[in-house]
Amino acid sequence: MIKKIGVLTSGGDAPGMNAAIRGVVRTALGAGLEVFGIYDGYQGLYEDRIKQLDRSSVSDVINRGGTFLGSARFPQFREVEVREKAIENLKKHGIEALVVIGGDGSYMGAKKLTEMGFPCIGLPGTIDNDIAGTDYTIGYLTALNTVIEAIDRLRDTSSSHQRISIVEIMGRHCGDLTLTSAIAGGCEYIITPETGLNMEQLISNIKDGIAKGKKHAIIALTELMMDANKLAKEIESATGRETRATVLGHIQRGGKPTAFDRVLASRMGNYAVHLLMEGHGGRCVGIQKEQLVHHDIIDAIENMKRPVRTDLYKVAEELF
């Protein structure tokens, strides 16, 4: 059985990452394993920023946002020589397996290490909720609450000024965060990678709302789809109603994780250690229908696709 494991966080931070690290560390120590923290993601792995952790290392972190191990984007990890150096550093410390917490880019790094014979377990840590093989990612529901709070505030001022507001929400190529934020925040319109934008229909809907006496409208837009400020100008020109864009940006990644994310992250961290002790490597952890599951990490990246939430889009359409 393995005796030493490492844990790192990579890519964009997400609330609950610290809880996941804590879950890994406390479970491993309780099972008699040694645990090493790799600081600043794959870059720290390459540069040998590796330190042994104990119980006190993860005291009072469960309620903190971000990741105390730090994170960094490190595109050089695509290079074989860089990964070979990383594995050399792991072996120098006697580390036999690695838990990687992050998004799809982090999973790709874990996949590459797995293909080179070093066992890794991936935990889905991203607010985008865009990882295949899991219903929820660590940090997604905390970010949802953050976005809803912002939408509530925008609604107050938009109503006061009879204004149309566009709120740009993170998610990259996945509209889950935008979709659920729009439903929970009572937005009038939604634009995601899954729905696209029918400008003619959008303008028609806004004009219909104005004719019915609506004082404001909130439009939820997934980032990277289009320039939010340009869209605001086009809507204002077409409707005659003042329109402003608000880009929430990185505020969505911060803040204390919700109870759900703390429990989810703790469960996933615990589960990852048990998988490694049972001899499983090259896996990624998810939660599906409230049950923890694990999938082949290569298959998850190359073949598995996240299902489009057609049920929620139907709800959104009927409510808007």
Swiss-Prot record:
Functional pathway: Carbohydrate degradation; glycolysis; D-glyceraldehyde 3-phosphate and glycerone phosphate from D-glucose: step 3/4
Record: residues binding ATP: 12, 73-74, 103-106
Role: Catalyzes the phosphorylation of D-fructose 6-phosphate to fructose 1,6-bisphosphate by ATP, the first committing step of glycolysis.
Obligatory cofactor(s): Mg(2+)
A single GO BP: fructose 1,6-bisphosphate metabolic process
GO molecular function (one): ATP binding
Protein name, as recorded: ATP-dependent 6-phosphofructokinase
GO cellular component terms listed in the entry, alphabetical order: 6-phosphofructokinase complex
